[in-house]
Amino acid sequence: MKKFLCIAFIALSQVLIAQDKGTVKGLLTDKEMSNEPLAFANVLIKGTAIGSTTDFDGLYSFKVPAGTHTVQFSFVGYKTIEKVFTIKAGETVTLNQLMSAEEGVGLDEVVVKSSTSKEKTSALILKQKKAVAITTTIGAQELSVKGVSDAEGAVTKTAGVSKGSKNVVVRGLGDRYNSTTLNGLPLPSEDPEYKNISLDFFGTGIIKNIEVNKVFTSELYGDVGGANINIASKELIKKSLLNVNASLGVNTQTVSKEFLTIDGTNRFGTQKASISVNDLSKYSFRNSFKPHSQDFQLNNSLSFAGGKKYDVGEDTFSFFIVGGFDGSYNYIDGNIKQTTSSGEIFQDQSFTKYEYNVSQILMANLQYKFEEGHNIAYNHLFIHNNKQSIGDYLGFNNPEQDGDLEFQRRQQTNNNELYVNQLIANYKFTERLDFKAKGSLNFIRGNEPDRRTNKYLFRDNYYSPETSSAGENERYFAKLEENDYAAKGKFSYKLKEDEEDVSTLEFGGDYRYTERLFSATIFNHDFSSRVAIDIENPDAVFSQSSIDNNIFELETGRGGASNPNAFVPFTYRGKRQIFAGFGNLVYQLGDNFIASVGGRFEKIQQRVTYNTNIAQSAIDGASNLDRTYVLPSFNLKYNFNENSILRIAGSQSYTFPQFKETAPFKYQDISFSSQGNPDLKPSDNYNLDAKYEYYMSSSELFTVTGFYKYIQNPISRSEIPSGGNTLTYLNVGDDASVYGIEIEARKNIYEIEDKDLKIMGGLNTSYLVSNVNLDANSVAQFTNTTSDLEGATPFLINADISINKKYNDNTFISSLVFNYFSERVYSVGTRGFANILEKGIPTLDLVSSYEFNENYRLKLKVTNLLNPNFQLSRAGFNGGDNVVLSNYKKGVNISLGFSYDF
């Protein structure tokens, strides 16, 4: 890496070209706010991508080629002003401007409509252009135009990013290789099964912008191989704001179906999670096995946002609050299969699944700005998510006799709460030295209360509970508590007084401590012989009278009533501590070349202790990891001219196993089970990127990126043939590689200014190749010698086209958004089992909105128009056809929304 850095410095230094330029600078003030400085306004040279945005003090400054130019000053809801000026090489021209509201627009309306330009596409493209590191930023404006409703939809519209089974996959690297931050502070997952929080919690109402950092820099935590996704939460910019949003919608294959719901749940997602049984001779569970039913399902959401700014002498205090409720139904039917290692199908069942997802969110931002460049802010985020599902499965499943059928019903609720508290302070010591301090206290409380699973054998023309294993009919209670603490401090020192020179020295430190306690209690029903059961009234058998009459015995996962430890839950406890220090030097070598070199030191300790339901885990097991990392990084930026940029970046990072990936707790699903691996080792990642950017205008660009990743000890999800077809996590080889190319373009296709008509298009696509040489000596006994990485998508395309038409005070926007990803590996096969593959699918969404008089807005959204099949399949045995293991459709979602700005 050092050799490459030297070569890059020498090569780029040889092509530095001096250009004759001058500096234009000035101050923008706000007539509507008593001539106060106007922050975040756009200042652009007309017809080019040259420009800047004003800072908090209304100031701007940038270099332009010598000659005569037209400068445009603009801000949302304000008049756009143009000025012609002439500048000579080495000259500084000062252009100050007083900005005012558009004619016929009152101050209150301006306040409602205005938003920070850090949400606007043009401003974020300028930010991307000026940045030293390679990054992609998506603002609230672009999300609205493309009909994106949350952060997950946003990042999957960027090159090289696709949606995975839970979260996103970046350049072929899934959940464990990525990281998520909120305002630059680490954010834990709301779901113990995953490292990253589900991005669909973050609706556009709370997003200012989203940064996708595919290149590691020293300020980031080192546990990232794919990308860091940083969500910047909204804050109040103008004097006041109040709006409400509501929508109703349907799913085409759900709306009129008879829909089953779980006893003990409700539409708000609140229920009792405690265990009501403390005596195995008493059947005192609160909830019934029999579900309820309804026949009309209407999706609904309601949200509000409000805030106000107060002057406190010469200082400013502001608050901003967002709240929301969302409930959605989904009905799917399909088929599941399982095979032996030789490809023989032993499970083939049709299924219907009823899903209801409800969430509530509350975000608050309090901010106090004092003196010049000083501010302190408190951010709070509360997310409650409740997922309820009932799955019915009918068919054969490893039958003992010809004609045997099995009916399975699984009723599951996952209830998770996330509490985020952040304190962020910025202090400016001098014009060249400032300090930023951040801290967070995050808490997760999750439970899976009373999951009910039944398996009934159909033989001799009647159903009976399975007698082969007591665990075939169970009630499962799980609870998770996690506390996460983080702190960060960073000094930034500007090395030169020249405002245009970006040379800066940054240094600081991080601390993070995370602790998790997971516990699960399982109740099994041990039937000694077959007994007839009405599957529509199972509580007639699962009752106190059946225990009294010795039809079944109630026991826990640890044994029956005679076991003194019967009620001791299965547990694992995880603790992780990270100490880090970092430094970064940005140095400008002339007008065209900037180099950034950084390093990060991390000391990480992780201990997972467990007492679980896997026999070989022993009574008290432990998985300990203790690592020290020194992580170098560099970024080189060369401007051929104002609109043409080349960037090169390299870094080293790592991927650390998560708590649940090392804890050998077995989690049972319908056709798979999963468990951790206490022998899992971290991965080391080496990353190299080269990116060319061409800016056609302030809102148009074309980029090409080539990337290469080398991973030592890569981690993949792998299948181990055992009871229930178990998935686990393995270091699948000594090394793996991923390389590919990404192309992105944004273009104004057609525009008639005097008719206020604009048609815009966006396209990004990626092609990648991944390979891992599987460890032939592994105890996993991999079926193949090589494989693609789990989740690696060879081909990915995102495209959108939008039309924007204004009619006097009304605005119509409509967008068509397309996405496609090709087939990819879901899990790596072992011991004769072939890889499980996830079928590539296309999606197409239509989003239209109509704004009336700047206060009222109607929005029509139709998603998943193509309604493709979602499939998992196992690669064919000895070159035969793939066996489809799971197949279903999700239906088309249609919603109509209304919003009002007060």
What kind of feature is each model-predicted range?
Residues N713, Y820-S827, S849-F902:
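C-terminal beta-signal and adjacent terminal beta-strands/loops
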Residues T23, N287-G391, Y419-V420, T430, ...:
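Transmembrane beta-barrel wall of Gram-negative outer-membrane proteins
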Residues G706-Y710, Y729-R824:
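Gram-negative outer-membrane beta-barrel transporters
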Residues G403-I424, A566-Q577, L625, Y654-I711, ...:
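Outer-membrane beta-barrel signature, preferentially recognizing the C-terminal barrel domain
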Residues T29-S34, A41-L44, F75-V76, T92-Q141:
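Short, acidic, small-residue-rich periplasmic hinge/interaction motif at the N-terminus
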Residues F202-N245, D901:
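A beta-strand signature from Gram-negative outer-membrane beta-barrel systems
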Residues L185-P186, N386, R445-N447, S464, ...:
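Surface-exposed extracellular loop regions of Gram-negative outer-membrane beta-barrel proteins
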Residues S117-K118, L126-D175, G184-F202, I206-S218, ...:
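Periplasmic N-terminal accessory/gating domains of Gram-negative outer-membrane beta-barrel systems
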